[in-house]
Every structure is written in structure tokens, then in C-alpha cells.
Amino acid sequence: MKQLLDFLPLVIFFAVYKFFDIYIASGALIVATALQLVVTYLLYKKIEKMHLITFAMVSFFGTLTLVFHDDAFIKWKVTVVYALFALALALSQYLKKPILKGMLGKELIVADKIWSRVTWYWVTFFLACGLVNIYVAFNLSQETWVNFKVFGLTALTLINTVITVVYLYKHMPEEHKKELK
């Protein structure tokens, strides 16, 4: 259910874009992201920082898109969010409080050097996605960008998640692997 809620604003953005335009879709994205926060809180009595940051960025860039009637703002939102995620991961690693280990370290027991590699892998991934987003957003058609944002970046993130889980599992001690089975 929680994963479905995570994708709901993206699905709404895509559907509204297909039936209307980027501006109505941007407004729908703001509303859908706000509703996502409300529903998440009602169901789980908690809102993750990532959702708050995403809502802030969607609201800020979406509002600029609507006020100035310029789709460049909503296109930049994707890159800014990825850059913030990369920065947060890099800072957490630098401060010796890795976010990924904090999120998954209880279930996936691996050495700190493995968490460090995974963290830098995701930093690189987020930065690369942000750069590719800039290229697609400003060199290809708006429709291509929307499809890339919805399907391309989502697929890349899912593939990256699978690669990360396989890598972490490979480096887990055997006794912990047995507990997961």
C-alpha cells in the first residue's frame, strides 16, 4: 500500500498530462502530493522526510511553473530533487551517519565499507539521473521528457534498487542470509 501511495502523484501527473497539458498536470501534481502526505499520515501516523522534501519541491517548482507559465521550472524540479538526495547521502556518509544503513541496516547486516560503497553508488546514480534529466528536458520534446520522467527514471530507480539488494545480499554473512529465507 505504501509503495502504491509513493507512485500515485506520478501516475496522476502522467494521466492529467495526457488528457490536458503540462500546466494542469503540474497543478494536479501539487494537489496529489499534498493528498499523499495526508493519506500517509492518516494511515501510518508518520510522514517521512523524503516525502516532505518532495512535497516542498513539487509545491515550489510547480507553483513557479503555473505562475510564470513556463514548464522549465517543473523540469528542473526533478534534477533539484535528485541533487538534494545525492547531497543528503554524501553528507550522511561524510558525517559517518549513513542514511541507507540507518534505513536498512537492521534487516541487512553488512560491513560498513559495503554501506559506504552502496551510498556512493546511489550518490552517483542520483547525480547521473539529474544530469540526464536536464539533457532530456531541454533537448527533446516535452512529451518525451514526461515519458522519460514517468517511465525511464522509475525503471532506472527500480533496476538500481534490485542491483543494490543483490549486492548487499552477496555481502551478508551466511547466518543472516538464512534468517531472511
Curated annotation (Swiss-Prot):
Residues spanning the membrane: 11-31, 50-70, 72-92, 118-138, 148-168
UniProt keyword annotations, A-Z: Cell inner membrane, Cell membrane, Membrane, Transmembrane, Transmembrane helix
**In this UniProt entry, which cysteines form S-S bonds?**
none
Kindly indicate whether the keyword Cell membrane belongs to this entry. Answer: yes
Topology class, membrane: Multi-pass membrane protein
Q: Which GO terms describe its cellular component?
A: plasma membrane
Q: Where in the cell is it found?
A: Cell inner membrane
Q: Which Pfam families match?
A: IspA
Q: Which family does it belong to?
A: Belongs to the YciB family.
The UniProt entry, under HAMAP family, shows: YciB (MF_00189)
Outline what the protein does. Answer: Plays a role in cell envelope biogenesis, maintenance of cell envelope integrity and membrane homeostasis.
What is the name listed in the Swiss-Prot or TrEMBL entry for this protein? Inner membrane-spanning protein YciB
Lineage start: Bacteria, Pseudomonadati, Pseudomonadota, Gammaproteobacteria, Alteromonadales
Q: Which gene encodes it?
A: yciB
